[in-house]
């Protein structure tokens, strides 16, 4: 095999169809776009239109709703906590709460509160204050000799002003 003998596989580089180049090309005049009108112009795609067939988003039933009172909790796993303690970002002797987690960089923000999840292993004895925790997370913390305190959900600033 020589460098000047290397060639592409047959059909790997397909020739581009040049449209609008005369009636003899088979793609002249309307260039395969049908007649005139909106769809013959460039940059036109009617979102969700399926050629008159009932579109999928109308064939399927409506379902659910968006709860405006939904509280999104930031999630943190036990292994992330242990890594932060090992790296001396978190003080295991002090109470670990949302503020401490944000300050140490474990979480970026804890707007609605913090939920503790049970992935990983916790070796340090810690006191944790969170807004939610899984059973496995609570068991793992208590097994390591620590404690978990579940706080009441955070109130919105708007709700606090109203009352």
Swiss-Prot record:
Keywords: Ribonucleoprotein, Ribosomal protein, RNA-binding, rRNA-binding. InterPro entries: Ribosomal_uL15, Ribosomal_uL15/eL18, Ribosomal_uL15/eL18_sf, Ribosomal_uL15_bac-type, Ribosomal_uL15_CS. Residues 1-43 are annotated as: Disordered. Residues 21-37 have a biased composition (Gly residues). One of its GO terms (molecular function) is rRNA binding. The keyword DNA damage does not apply. Belongs to the universal ribosomal protein uL15 family. Binds to the 23S rRNA. This is Large ribosomal subunit protein uL15. The gene is rplO.
């Amino acid at each position: 095999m020589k460098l000047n003998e290397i060639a592409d596989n047959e059909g790997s580089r397909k020739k581009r169809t040049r449209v609008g180049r005369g009636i003899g090309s088979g793609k002249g005049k309307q260039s395969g776009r049908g007649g005139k009108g909106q769809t013959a112009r460039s940059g036109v795609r009617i979102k969700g239109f399926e050629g008159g067939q009932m579109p999928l988003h109308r064939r399927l039933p409506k379902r659910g709703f968006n709860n405006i009172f939904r509280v999104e909790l930031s999630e943190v796993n036990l292994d992330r906590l242990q890594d932060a303690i090992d790296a001396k970002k978190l003080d295991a002797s002090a109470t670990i709460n949302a503020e401490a987690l944000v300050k140490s960089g474990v979480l970026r923000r804890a707007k609605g509160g913090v939920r503790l999840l049970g992935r990983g292993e916790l070796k340090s004895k810690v006191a944790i204050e969170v807004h939610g925790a899984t059973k496995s997370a609570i068991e793992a913390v208590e097994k390591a000799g620590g404690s978990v305190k579940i706080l009441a959900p955070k109130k919105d600033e708007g709700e606090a002003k109203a009352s």
